[in-house]
Amino acid sequence: MKRNIAIVAGGDTSEIVVSLRSAQGIYSFIDKEKYNLYIVEMEGRRWEVQLPDGSKTPVDRNDFSFINGAEKVVFDFAYITIHGTPGEDGRLQGYFDMMRIPYSCCGVLAAAITYDKFVCNQYLKAFGVRISESLLLRQGQAVSDEDVVEKIGLPCFIKPNLGGSSFGVTKVKTREQIQPAIAKAFSEAEEVMIEAFMGGTELTCGCYKTKEKSVVFPLTEVVTHNEFFDYDAKYNGQVDEITPARISEELTRRVQTLTSAIYDILGCSGIIRVDYIITEGEKINLLEVNTTPGMTATSFIPQQVRAAGLDIKDVMTDIIENKF
């Protein structure tokens, strides 16, 4: 009998549009001869299943099921592709743990740690991972322009500590830009991270592990035409994504080894993607860890899967079957 798979998308942040795109990508990637696929949209208290005829019906949160005509369909597995809360920060993972429903990505603790950029960076720093200097501001806290310049320097990045897709991010070059950038970041989240700028080559590396194997994908080099890899660059084509990256085999191996180590240190599950900046002297610096990476047809992970000579359908099957 085919397993019923929920591709869980939506969420409660500005990244909802990106999440819904990823859901369509994942729907196209998963083997439909092996699984019954449904996209589940979540936004606040609204949990709905998209039915084949285009209509939607509510999800019963008591057992994660829905009614389709005269049939009750109970989901066997959740492929979480919410970028942001509640799917990337551990909240939804906690629900599925209580329901005893396996899911595609990291558990509660790993998701919570990686969603908090400042906490994740400080945690990995304790294991010898290089990070940039940063400050954390919580709602109601303030910092002077002088402190930012003295402790972090210019240029710097001011961004929401929680969230992704570069919403609310500003590359700050002058003192006059600091406070407006902080206000912009606070409009997206309750915590703001002020991070030192690092110039260099931006790379990203995907990885997943199952009970039988460990797979680290070829690296992608990110060359943006904008000031930085912002939303416009990510989703409107203002970037060159080169897979495999134009770097030495030795540096490639070092980045892949570090990515695998970060996976294990954090206790990850499913597919992750780790972003880096390579600075002078081939120093590898962590930018962030993504535990629910984008999965549209043109996203980094599908590109890297193709470059590795793998079939994305087989990778999706690995992720699902590893939980049974």
Swiss-Prot record:
Ranges for domain ATP-grasp: 121-321
Catalytic activity: 2 D-alanine + ATP = D-alanyl-D-alanine + ADP + phosphate + H(+)
SUPFAM superfamilies in alphabetical order: Glutathione synthetase ATP-binding domain-like, PreATP-grasp domain
UniProt xrefs under InterPro entries: ATP-grasp, ATP_grasp_subdomain_1, D-Ala_lig_Van_CS, D_ala_D_ala, Dala_Dala_lig_C, Dala_Dala_lig_N, PreATP-grasp_dom_sf
Keyword Transport included in the entry's annotation: no
Cofactor note: Binds 2 magnesium or manganese ions per subunit.
EC class of the enzyme, as a word: ligase
Residue sites binding Mg(2+) 1 per the record: D275, E288
Pathway entry: Cell wall biogenesis; peptidoglycan biosynthesis
Protein's GO biological process: cell wall organization; peptidoglycan biosynthetic process; regulation of cell shape
MF annotations from Gene Ontology: ATP binding; D-alanine-D-alanine ligase activity; metal ion binding
Keyword annotations from UniProtKB, A to Z: ATP-binding, Cell shape, Cell wall biogenesis/degradation, Cytoplasm, Ligase, Magnesium, Manganese, Metal-binding, Nucleotide-binding, Peptidoglycan synthesis
Main subcellular location: cytoplasm
Binding residues annotated for ATP, in chain numbering: 149-204
Binding site for Mg(2+) 2: E288, N290
Highest rank taxon of the organism: Bacteria
Assigned EC number: 6.3.2.4
Cofactor: Mg(2+); Mn(2+)
Location relative to the cell: Cytoplasm
One cellular component (GO) term of this entry: cytoplasm
Protein family according to the UniProt entry: Belongs to the D-alanine--D-alanine ligase family.
Function statement: Cell wall formation.
NCBIfam families membership: D_ala_D_alaTIGR, PRK01372.1, PRK01966.1-3
Protein name: D-alanine--D-alanine ligase
Species: Bacteroides fragilis (strain YCH46)
